[in-house]
Amino acid sequence: MKTFTAKKETVERDWYLVNADGKTLGRLATELARRLRGKHKPEYTPHVDTGDYLIVINAEKISVTGKKRKDKIYYRHTGYVGGIKQTTFEEMIARHPERVIEIAVKGMLPKGPLGRAMYRKLKVYKGATHHHIAQQPKVLNI
């Protein structure tokens, strides 16, 4: 009996809608990364993108435990000498709440072309509306 290997042409992908309201950031991000990779499917193959599309709404209502709301710091670099910038979790939620979830999930995906393809299937929105009604996403309770 041969080991089954998924082919990228035959992988069936579904669209799921996830509500981030009241969810803990890390616990939500791990489940999103797992589903983007396709590890929840029996036909999971490490070198093939077998994951589903995920739409996350209410990104601004995500929660963190402890004092991370004030203490957690996100760093980025402009590319210029001495151009390191830092933003706290509170500031990030106020300005770009979708980036908080995107950064957390991106760090949990593989680095390289396959990881970037998986990351592109994640759609995060502030508020309860999204632009993917035509895909008829199924509600996913995490």
UniProtKB/Swiss-Prot annotation:
This protein's UniProt keywords = Ribonucleoprotein, Ribosomal protein
| Annotated SUPFAM superfamilies | Ribosomal protein L13 (SSF52161)
Disulfide-bond pairs as recorded: none
**GO term, biological process aspect, one:** translation
A Gene Ontology MF term for this entry? Answer: mRNA binding
Question: For this UniProt entry, what's an example GO CC term?
Answer: cytosolic large ribosomal subunit
Known Pfam families for this protein? Ribosomal_L13
Membrane-crossing residues? none
Q: Entry's InterPro entries?
A: Ribosomal_uL13 (IPR005822), Ribosomal_uL13_bac-type (IPR005823), Ribosomal_uL13_CS (IPR023563), Ribosomal_uL13_sf (IPR036899)
Q: Which family does it belong to?
A: Belongs to the universal ribosomal protein uL13 family.
Q: How does it assemble?
A: Part of the 50S ribosomal subunit.
Q: What task does this protein carry out?
A: This protein is one of the early assembly proteins of the 50S ribosomal subunit, although it is not seen to bind rRNA by itself. It is important during the early stages of 50S assembly.
Q: What's the name of the protein?
A: Large ribosomal subunit protein uL13
Give the species this sequence originates from: Hamiltonella defensa subsp. Acyrthosiphon pisum (strain 5AT)
**Taxonomic lineage from the root:** Bacteria, Pseudomonadati, Pseudomonadota, Gammaproteobacteria, Enterobacterales
